[in-house]
């Protein structure tokens, strides 16, 4: 019986390793596997830590840029939660949101790659090669695009680049896959001046 139990444990370990390309909330941090719209995360500090990122009481602007994430469920745009990687104004990850527009703030003390996997781990959302939240293949197709070009690697590995538009599409796609984003249309409470659009890798509208 003990040998059989050991064999089962080993098999489960190997199976988990084979299911790469996914985020993990940790054993005490369950991931949201429900339908959209998805809420703000709980246990914010713990989820920042699970993403392998530091937290601080202030925002660091040594490295400062922005990306934009759209999520479409059967052609409908769904909001990105407004407090990912952030707890009020008292706790910040270098990777966070301030509104539901999909604008992703990268404000870090030093250069590093920030990925979609980190974002979804902070959010507490399931993301694998086949599933996002409560939607999974083969029932629902899951694809991603970066600046309008289909991304063929695991979605979790997408690096959030300066000014980039990332679209994650679940089920039937929207009429148009966005290849860019409008800075002025995505101004949120953390943006005080439209001239900051230049900081996002975009031209300031005339």
Describe each region flagged by the PLM.
Residues 1-8:
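Bacterial N-terminal signal peptides that target proteins for export
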Residues 20-206:
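Ubiquitin-like/PB1-type beta-grasp interaction modules and other compact soluble beta-rich domains
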Residues 15-18:
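C-terminal motif of bacterial Sec signal peptides marking the signal peptidase cleavage site
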Residues 11:
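Flanking scaffold residues of small Cys/His-coordinated metal-binding clusters
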């Amino acid at each position: 019986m003990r040998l059989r139990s050991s064999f089962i444990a080993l098999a489960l370990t190997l199976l988990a390793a084979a299911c790469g390309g996914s985020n993990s909330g940790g054993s005490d941090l369950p991931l949201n596997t429900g339908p959209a719209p998805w809420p703000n995360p709980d246990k914010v500090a713990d989820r920042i830590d699970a993403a392998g990122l530091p937290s601080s009481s202030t925002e660091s602007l040594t490295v400062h840029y922005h990306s934009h994430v759209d999520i479409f469920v059967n052609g409908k745009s769904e909001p990105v939660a407004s407090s990912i990687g952030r707890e009020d104004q008292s706790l910040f990850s270098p990777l966070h949101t301030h509104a539901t527009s999909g604008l992703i703030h990268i404000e870090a003390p030093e250069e590093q790659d920030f990925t979609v996997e980190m974002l979804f781990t902070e959010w507490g959302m399931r993301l694998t090669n086949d599933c996002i939240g409560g939607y999974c293949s083969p029932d629902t197709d899951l694809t991603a695009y970066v600046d309008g070009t289909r991304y063929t690697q695991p979605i979790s590995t997408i690096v959030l680049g300066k000014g980039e538009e990332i679209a994650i599409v679940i089920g039937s796609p929207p009429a148009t896959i966005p290849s860019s984003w409008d800075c002025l249309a995505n101004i949120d409470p953390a943006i005080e001046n439209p001239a900051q659009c230049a900081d996002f890798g975009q031209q300031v509208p005339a």
